[in-house]
Amino acid sequence: MPAVATFHLLRWQNTLGMVQALVFDRVRYRRTTGLQFLRVLGTGKGSSTAPGTEFGRTALFCLFDDEQSADAHIAQVARRNGLAESWHVKLRGAGGHGSWHGVQIPRIMHDASLPPAPGPMAFITRANIRARSWRAFSRDAAIIDRELHHSDGLLAVVGVGEAPILRLGTFSVWRDVAAMTTFAQRQPEHNRVVVRTRSERWYGEEMFARFTPYWSTGSWDGRNPLDAA
C-alpha cells in the first residue's frame, strides 16, 4: 500500500504557541504510530513565497505508512490547545523528483497503478540553498512570487522553511495540473530562474513533488482552498 502524506497549516493564538511548536513538535510527534517522515516548518508572510517569516503560524509535513496512522495524527494535531485556525489535507503521491534530507518522497509515494487524477493538485518545492547563492536566490524569489500570484488557477500558496534562510520551500494548491504546468513552463521569469539555478548550482539538494489532495478539513485564512476547485 502506498504511503500517505499529510500537510497541516497551523495558526496559533500567540507567538509563544508558534515558538513552542517549532521547538517541541519534533519530539512530540517522533513516536507517532506509522510515521515515516516528519518536518516541522515555519511559514512565510501571508501568501508570499519570498524569504520572510509570519510569526504565529507553523506547518507540518508528514509521511505515514497507511491511512489509519494518518487519520490518527490529523485528529491529534487538530485537537492541539492554542490553535486559532488549522487546515489539514491528505495527499496521494503523483510524481516528481528529488529528495528531502535524503528521503526520496516522490519515489516512496509513487503508485503506478493509479492513473493521473483530474481536479486539484498540490505541489511542494523545497531546496537547501547554498550560502554563496543566497543573495541571488532572495532577489529572484521576490520576482517569481509576483509572477506566481498572477497565475490563473492558483488556489492557495504558502512559503515554508526549516529555517528562516537557506532551507526553504513552498506548498501550493492549484485548480489542476495544467494550471501549474502553464506557470512552470510558460512564465518567462520562472523559466529564467530555473535555468540559472541549474547552471550556477544554487542548491545542495532539491525536491519537486506533485500530490493529489483527496481529503481536507479546517480553514486556511478563513476558507478551505479546495472548496474553490
Predicted regions and their residues:
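Short proline/glycine-enriched turn/loop segments at secondary-structure junctions
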Residues: A50, R198-S199
